[in-house]
Amino acid sequence: LKMGAMFVLLLLFTLASSQQEGDVQARKTSLKSDFYRALRQYDRQCTLVNNCDRNGERACNGDCSCEGQICKCGYRVSPGKSGCACTCRNAK
């Protein structure tokens, strides 16, 4: 009887652990898609005037300016658009 009860408890614990792992993976996927969605919205606000990487692609320290916005040159990592870029946000 003791062995049977221990087996059932072990089985329940294993099932609960795998469910938690699935929840964590689902949350990671959701966070990643939210992050990329935010990046796309952030990019839409920028009107690029000068080229960030004109002083050398590795330096990523060229001039970056946006009309009526706060901007900086930096490395952007997103699907299909990675590299040095001007990131801007509205001045509030």
Curated annotation (Swiss-Prot):
**UniProt keywords, alphabetically:** Disulfide bond, Neurotoxin, Pyrrolidone carboxylic acid, Secreted, Signal, Toxin
Give an example GO cellular component term for this record: extracellular region
Post-translational modification summary for this protein: Contains 5 disulfide bonds.
Tissue spec: Expressed by the venom duct.
Major subcellular location class: secreted
How does the record comment on the protein's domains? The cysteine framework is VIII (C-C-C-C-C-C-C-C-C-C).
What is the protein's given name? Conotoxin Ac8.1
Phylogenetic lineage: Eukaryota, Metazoa, Spiralia, Lophotrochozoa, Mollusca
